[in-house]
Amino acid sequence: MAKKSVANLTEADLSGKRVFVRVDFNVPLNESGVITDDTRIRAALPTIKYLTEKGAKVILGSHMGRPKGQVVDSMRLTPVAARLSELLGQSVTKCDDCVGDAVNQAIANLGNGQVALLENLRFNPGEEKNDPEFAKQLAANADIYVNDAFGTAHRAHGSTEGVTHHVDTSVAGLLIEKELQFLKGAIEAPKRPLVAIVGGSKVSSKIGVIETLLEKCDKLLIGGGMIFTFYKAQGKSVGGSLVEDDKIDLAKSLMEKAQGKILLPTDVIVADKFAPDAEAKTVSVDAIPDGWMGLDIGADSVKVFQEALDGCGTAIWNGPMGVFEFDKFAVGTEAIAKTLAGATETGTVTIIGGGDSVAAVEKVGVADKMSHISTGGGASLELLEGKELPGIVALDDA
């Protein structure tokens, strides 16, 4: 079911109204409390600016880290308020709590087009418990609710689900609208052929995605550490590579179900130890030496994967091809990132499905060349699995 978007609200709907926006400002800080990557803050700007330009009083709420219902000074959102003020070109009021009299007063003092940022929502135990009383307190300061935090949309928390029960209008922000358009679109009505690339170290964390994508896609390329569980299922020797022995039967059944849709690497780069300075060599997947572990896909596999991606209508990528944190074993991941960047230019819809793949395309410097980069980790996976996300379900239907 399509959801109502903030873009459906006009100046008449918004001017002078208090709008509570759940954003995802869970940004990394260094030891000095300086933000090292402000991507998530910048991603929320279109929604915030849309609201301020139409005269709304904007109240932002986010979590940072996992304080588990306690106040943790190193997880305060003060540096976020400072950075947001710079990006918006206006002073953002920073509250020292997320509910209570001082917060109510700060919001009452907001003028049209002004912005306040609440303190870390997870300092309050009611947030993660989805406590109705906490949700009611959050909603007391809002005429309209906007969810633009895709990264937490798969959680039924006070600020993502509970608050919608106490506000008349609940809509998706521009970022969530774009996520739904691309991720749901890729699964429900993709431009074909649809090729999916799934990587990462464990089959167990990607089972749901692999099963759903197998039904929907024309080809499924598998890389990363999980390939060794598939090889073992085929009776190959995998040396010292990572294997989930309890998932071998599952890998077998996925291969049977796939009816030739799954493409596995034919060669891998193996290492004598798990370290950036390990000795490395490329071997066939039928000749992995004892004691050596596969840490990347080989050059032949890269070629085969590139051919499979050539001319595809839609490509979805989730998970790296190898241990891309070590430069020696980042070759496969970087090659896929560059291939997808090139494919976008020739008309392929390229979707980077959250998590480590996002870090990979950023590392290679091709993030701006993709059609869509998802801001969710678990939320992206669950949407690609075809699951309903509580934070989305709770919004008003279009």
Swiss-Prot record:
Q: Which Gene3D superfamilies match?
A: Phosphoglycerate kinase, N-terminal domain (3.40.50.1260)
Provide one Gene Ontology cellular component.
cytosol
The protein's location, in the record's own words, is: Cytoplasm
Alphabetical keyword list: ATP-binding, Cytoplasm, Glycolysis, Kinase, Nucleotide-binding, Transferase
Enzyme class, top EC level, equals transferase
Give a GO biological-process term: glycolytic process
Q: Which SUPFAM superfamilies match?
A: Phosphoglycerate kinase (SSF53748)
What does the subunit comment say? Monomer.
Name of the featured protein: Phosphoglycerate kinase
Q: Which organism is it from?
A: Picosynechococcus sp. (strain ATCC 27264 / PCC 7002 / PR-6) (Agmenellum quadruplicatum)
